Structure formats: C-alpha cells, structure tokens
From Swiss-Prot:
Subunit-level organization: Heterodimer of an alpha and a beta subunit.
Gene: etfB
Top-rank lineage group of the source organism: Bacteria
GO biological process: butyrate metabolic process
Protein name: Electron transfer flavoprotein subunit beta
Cross-referenced Pfam families: ETF
The species this protein was found in: Syntrophomonas wolfei subsp. wolfei (strain DSM 2245B / Goettingen)
Family annotation (Gene3D superfamilies): HUPs (3.40.50.620)
Organism classification: Bacteria, Bacillati, Bacillota, Clostridia, Eubacteriales
Length: 252
C-alpha cells in the first residue's frame, strides 16, 4: 500500500516540570518543552505502519509558535518524512487549533490522520474529534491497536473494562491511547537526518477562539503530614486519637 499518514502533534510542558504562575499566567521561562507524549505514541504508530509497508509517507503537523518546531523535529528524528508548522497564537483554544490543523490537512489529502487522544497540558481531548468533524471524516478514539486493509481501518479501543473493535473506511481520524505502543528513542543518525528533512510553514486559518482564559491558579498547598515518633504502642494510641478527633474516623 502507498498510504499517506499525517500525524498531528503538539508541544507541551515536560510532565515533570514544576509549573509557576506570574500575573495570573503560566511562567514558561526555563520550563522544558517536549512533544506531547500521547502524540509521540501516534508518531510511533505511523512509523510502524510504514515499516509494515502500509504507509509510504508520514507527515507531521503542529499548530503553535516557533517553539512547536521542536516537536516536529522530534517526530522527524523518530522517522517521519516531513513536517508542517501552522503558525498560530499559543492562546488559541481547541476550536481554533482544530480549524488551523484541519485547513493544513485539507492541503495534504492524507489517507490516515493520527493524533494522541489528549494533550498532557490541557487534558481537553477535543482536537482530534473537532478535526474529524470539520473534515467530515469518521473518528475512532483511544485506540490500542489498528489494522489497515482494503481501504478500511479496524481499530481496537478500550471500553468499559473491555475492548471494542470498530471498522471505518479511509480516510479517517484515529486517536491513540498510550498503551498502543512504546515510542522509540530517536537515534543520533535520526537526529542528524531530521535537520535536513523539509518543514513547511503556513499561516493559521482565521478562526476566533470560543473560550477565553481569564487567569490560572494553582491548587492550595497541601498541609504538612503528621509525624509521630515514640514507642509503637504510644504511636498507635496517638494515631487513633488523631484519626478520631481530626478526620472523624470511628475508632473501635
């Protein structure tokens, strides 16, 4: 098969990063940015389809500032063929981002559109579904396996403690769960090759965000834990009293 696979990726904060606020906004200075881990799974899935002879070309597309170029380069180093950066204000909401991505996708006419089912930073799980709706394509969410044959995708998804198998005609939007695969680490050869792979830039399609973020706030700090240092019997008594009087646990 000679299918074109397009993967939507996003640049997000490192999941281990400590988030700080300044004037009601996220202070991103000095915070490490990475490719969204869920999108990384989608990239790996695309590469595996190419290794199986299903896909001929893998295109990655990201919407955002120039910083999103790092996410694209990571995908290229993993094995994608070329990239597209849709230049867009990072404050754009999921609707505006989906419009921008969908417009870029239209120009590529891919057979399969992959994405992580959620972004690690906002957790909205909206963009793949919105892209599918805008393009008028079928969408299968949180897949853990996919087989391509006869112009159709047979997808396995998690569902209520079991699995669900869905068959859709291509082209289609398919969003992945992290359990689909284990993304590979880019090799040094891949990293060097990624620098020479083409990345086109495009202006985002005009779309006004439907959601406006007024400010961010951090959750209240957790109270310090209780530490009891004494003989075991005394510790047990003190702990029982604390549970009874503080958290209102019935102690018998």
């Amino acid at each position: 098969m000679n299918l074109k696979v397009l993967v939507c990726v996003k640049q997000t904060f490192d999941t281990e990063a400590k988030i700080e606020l300044k004037d009601g906004k996220i202070a991103d200075a000095g915070i490490n940015l990475i490719i969204n881990p869920y999108d990384e799974v989608a990239v790996e899935g695309a590469i595996q389809l190419k290794e199986k002879g299903v896909a001929k070309e893998i295109v990655v597309v990201a919407a955002g500032s120039d910083k999103a170029m790092d996410a694209i380069r990571t995908a290229l180093a993993m094995g994608a063929d070329r990239g597209i950066l849709v230049q867009q204000d990072t404050a754009a909401d999921e609707f505006a981002r989906a419009v921008a991505l969908a417009e870029a996708i239209k120009g590529e006419n891919p057979d399969i559109i992959l994405a992580g089912h959620v972004a690690a930073d906002d957790g909205s799980s909206q963009v793949p579904t919105r892209v599918a709706e805008i393009l008028g394509l079928p969408h299968v969410n949180v897949i853990t396996a996919v087989e391509i044959a006869g112009g159709k995708a047979t997808c396995t998804s998690e569902a209520d403690g079991g699995t669900q198998v869905t068959e859709v005609s291509l082209p289609a939007v398919i969003s992945s769960q992290v359990s689909w695969n284990e993304p590979r680490y880019p090799s040094m050869k891949g990293i060097m090759a990624a620098k020479k792979k083409p990345v086109a830039t495009a202006a985002a399609a005009a779309a006004e965000s439907k959601v406006k973020i007024l400010e961010f706030s951090l959750p209240p700090a957790k109270a310090a834990g209780i530490k009891i240092e004494d003989e075991p019997e005394v510790c047990a008594t003190k702990l029982a009293e604390w549970m009874k009087n503080t958290v209102k646990v019935e102690v018998k």
